[in-house]
UniProtKB/Swiss-Prot annotation:
Protein family (similarity comment): Belongs to the long (4 C-C) scorpion toxin superfamily. Sodium channel inhibitor family. Beta subfamily.
Subcellular location: Secreted
Domain of life assignment: Eukaryota
InterPro entries recorded: LCN-type_CS_alpha_beta_dom (IPR044062), Scorpion_toxin-like_sf (IPR036574), Scorpion_toxinL/defensin (IPR002061)
Protein name: Toxin Tpa8
Record lineage: Eukaryota, Metazoa, Ecdysozoa, Arthropoda, Chelicerata
Signal peptide stretch: 1-20
Organism: Tityus pachyurus (Colombian scorpion)
Sequence ranges assigned to domain LCN-type CS-alpha/beta in this UniProt record: 24-98
Length: 101
C-alpha cells in the first residue's frame, strides 16, 4: 500500500512540474519596431547607453518580461512569457546578450 501511495505522490509532482510555465529570453517581436538587424524587434542605441537601457527595460516590461537591455542595437528581454513571439537569432548572439546583462 505504501509503494502505491508513493508512486501516486511522485506522479502528482511530475504532473505539476510539467504544467509550470517556463520563461524565455530574446528579442521580442514588436509591431513597427523595424530594427534592420533583428526584424521586428525594438531598435535601441544612442550615445547615452543608460537611456537606451531604460528604453529597452520599458519595452520589455510592457510585453511581460522581467527586464531588458540594449544589446547589439536592439532590445533584448529577460524572462518573457512563452506566448511572446521572439525574433529567431543564432544561439551565440543570445548567449552573448545573456552574458553581458
Amino acid at each position: 500500500m505504501v509503494k502505491s501511495e508513493m508512486k501516486l505522490v511522485i506522479f502528482s509532482l511530475f504532473l505539476l512540474l510539467i504544467g509550470v510555465e517556463s520563461l524565455k529570453n530574446g528579442y521580442p517581436v514588436i509591431e513597427g519596431g523595424g530594427s534592420p538587424d533583428y526584424g521586428e524587434s525594438a531598435e535601441c542605441g544612442s550615445e547615452d547607453s543608460n537611456s537606451a537601457d531604460n528604453f529597452c527595460n520599458d519595452i520589455c516590461t510592457n510585453v511581460g518580461g522581467k527586464s531588458g537591455d540594449c544589446c547589439l542595437g536592439s532590445c533584448f528581454c529577460f524572462d518573457l512569457p512563452d506566448e511572446q513571439k521572439t525574433v529567431e537569432v543564432m544561439d551565440r548572439t543570445k548567449e552573448y546578450c545573456e552574458f553581458v546583462e
